[in-house]
Amino acid sequence: MAALLGVNIDHVATLRQARGTRYPDPVSAALVCEQAGAEGITLHLREDRRHIQDDDVRRMRPLLKTRMNLELAVTDEMIAFAKEIQPQHVCFVPERRQEVTTEGGLDVVGQFEKVKAATQTLAAVGCDVSLFIDADLAQIDAAIACGAPTIELHTGAYADAETEEQQQAELQRIIEGVEYAASKGLVVNAGHGLNLDNITPIAAIPQIHELNIGHSIIADSVFVGLAQAVQHMKAAIQAAR
């Protein structure tokens, strides 16, 4: 069975915010993605609100027919917002104001008690909590100890590798992380920097449950349309196994 496709629609909002307009509407984009075959919709409400806005999340939540995967920093403000919205899934991610995009995995080891408390708080209101981490065994063990049922492994280093040797080394690290986490009973997702050129080796890993992909799909949609861009990525994922 192929991995599921979660489409991240953040960069529809990026395009809107670039001009301060009301269009394009990320809620409308999410519905198109669902109709095109996406099995979930991912969006990141950043502390600086650089793309997705609170109102986007509120409007989208009751309209989705699949699942909302809301990415958030581990802060009191964001935890309170998630308790209000109650998305099916919450993925805790690291966040730095000066970064262009999320640059690495969450350091669960270094802020264990904080992450554990946040995980338990949202689990108590019915959210399936995942932690966006690097494929590092210590971080995976910490995620387990937090009580998170799901992790999402950061594929950025694989996607950004400049040589074939580097990419293969990163792929092997991801495979080992996936296999270890799955052997411990975790649901394992993956994402960041994935596109049609590099998706196949990741999508071929049998234990990966879902792949969350955004920027490359939105970029491809400029040329082929959003529905077709989603379908192209879904076809590539399905062909990998």
Swiss-Prot record:
Binding site for 3-amino-2-oxopropyl phosphate: 8, 19, 193, 214-215
Source species taxonomy: Bacteria, Pseudomonadati, Pseudomonadota, Gammaproteobacteria, Moraxellales
Keywords: Cytoplasm, Pyridoxine biosynthesis, Transferase
A GO-annotated cellular component: cytosol
Protein's recorded name: Pyridoxine 5'-phosphate synthase
Organism (species): Acinetobacter baylyi (strain ATCC 33305 / BD413 / ADP1)
Top-level taxonomic group: Bacteria
Family label: Belongs to the PNP synthase family.
HAMAP family given in the database record: PdxJ (MF_00279)
EC number annotated for this UniProt entry: 2.6.99.2
Gene name as annotated: pdxJ
GO biological-process terms attached to the record: pyridoxine biosynthetic process
InterPro entries associated with the record: Aldolase_TIM (IPR013785), PyrdxlP_synth_PdxJ (IPR004569), Pyridoxine-5'_phos_synth (IPR036130)
UniProt pathway: Cofactor biosynthesis; pyridoxine 5'-phosphate biosynthesis; pyridoxine 5'-phosphate from D-erythrose 4-phosphate: step 5/5
Reactions that this protein is recorded to catalyse: 3-amino-2-oxopropyl phosphate + 1-deoxy-D-xylulose 5-phosphate = pyridoxine 5'-phosphate + phosphate + 2 H2O + H(+)
Chief subcellular location: cytoplasm
Functional description taken from the UniProt entry: Catalyzes the complicated ring closure reaction between the two acyclic compounds 1-deoxy-D-xylulose-5-phosphate (DXP) and 3-amino-2-oxopropyl phosphate (1-amino-acetone-3-phosphate or AAP) to form pyridoxine 5'-phosphate (PNP) and inorganic phosphate.
Gene3D superfamilies: Aldolase class I
Binding locations of 1-deoxy-D-xylulose 5-phosphate: 10-11, 46, 51, 101
Quaternary state and interactors: Homooctamer; tetramer of dimers.
